[in-house]
């Protein structure tokens, strides 16, 4: 070969190789230096996924630090439809159904339809609001086609079942039970998509053996995650603690920062009231995925911040004793007369408004209430209703101490004035308008102290007549009646007394009639205000909030009076002495002789039109010479208030026998009913 020709070829080959190398270097430079960030972002978008790492909810304790609600780490199973083609979606979900059925694992179902034919609507399964929103989006109904129960009126449950089966392209030859489960899963996916997500949770708290089967079986779209579930460390205080649920049923949370469609939120009780403290801050992680959607690596993460620890004002040991005493009293009454009844107790600390115990009967168990929900929802006594805060009852004679102090302070009477009780009080100028004292023969000559001790209707009716309705309402309102008490879980405002057309009902309002109604908590707080010298505090359940990590205090409740009612010491002493006389020498003294603390009390019999079904009410405070706690009890169809006295003594003794156990309890007392 010609050497020159060979040299030229060699030069040409070298030049070509140089050009190839140059192109490679330029491309590499562009990929890594010039446009490196863009290429990396594109790679991440293609092969990685951002995931939320749920923060565990904060722990709830009682006033002494005893844990009431905590968390337990669990495995959850999610389905991500973005990892499965639409043609393969039903088949992928059917594989999941077969696996869950084989392992005996319950699949979460948020579709508010019964699981079996004829597929009637059943809101115990899911939210009616979410269903209606979905059906409106499909143009199957409009928002006008919704009944008072929040469910469609123009589409039956069975018709919806058939339409959804068709909408989701489900094989008609499948067993009905399988079709219903598959419809539920597809509906859960549709609900998630309405809120901008492709992922939904279909099983929680699953066993590790199932996790192994999931990983080994290559179940398309299925992802394993970790979460936490609430653990209830007590069987008591269910109405106070409340429960959590899915955010999808609660629109109030959906637009708040820090929440996702998978979030668990507080629905009732302190779980709801202190959501901002308990929720915590979710973390974030970016994970790489293979073609099947399995996580192959983690690119970065932001650690979740658990919710804060919330300490309540209640003493759980005392709460348990109050609930047991109330249950025993009601059970004994029911055993005797066969009448089912509800009841409630509220115990408030004088001078702070701390709620030390709230008992509502019947109650329920937070650890099993979801399984018991159908039974609880149909129970005529409504076990999930918090009678202590939401119950509205005529106060009866428990209101007489307040009427008495109003009469003294307004100048309607004095501590020295005596009025003769003949047994029948007649409205001046109207002989047809009258009321009898419970003692038909009358009490004879009484002052205000004696009137309270003897629960004299004659004396109190005269005070109501002298003051008039406006003055009564003014004083009742000062003591917090007719308005919420401030408790964070919410309570009824109750109702102040009112007039009927053409009548002056002030004499009857004075001893607890005339259309007025209050909750047991309102009655307890009025007594706390009275025996506390006129300082009225908002009732509350929050004691403090601490960081879940360091334990550092983040918030401490600072009790300040919301109102101070001026009362002369002479007037107040006379009223409180009348209550003390009742407990020591009056109608309930036989019960209070066994009380380990000196107490003062007032009974109340609330007429319901049937003397056999009169409600019983009872209020107390103790110790008499240094009031620490106030208590109110109401037992529906409980008869006279005196019948509640023995229960009150049980609770007082339980409370004071525990005062030496902890400095946090010392100086607090209670009463029950």
Briefly describe each language-model feature range.
Residues 1-276, 282-303, 336, 343:
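Membrane-proximal periplasmic segments of bacterial cell-envelope enzymes
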Residues 57, 73, 218, 325-352, ...:
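Flexible, solvent-exposed loop/hinge segments and secondary-structure transition points
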Residues 69, 75, 289-302, 314, ...:
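Beta-lactam-recognizing serine transpeptidase/beta-lactamase-like catalytic domain environment
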Residues 82-83, 635-639:
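A generic structural motif
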Residues 90-98, 208, 212, 216, ...:
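Solvent-exposed, polar/charged alpha-helical surfaces in well-ordered, non-transmembrane soluble domains
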Residues 252, 279-282, 293, 323-327, ...:
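Amphipathic, well-packed alpha-helical segments that form the structural scaffold of globular domains
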Residues 295-343:
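Conserved, well-ordered alpha-helix/loop/beta-strand core segments that scaffold catalytic motifs
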Residues 531, 583, 649-660:
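Short amphipathic alpha-helical signal-transduction/dimerization elements
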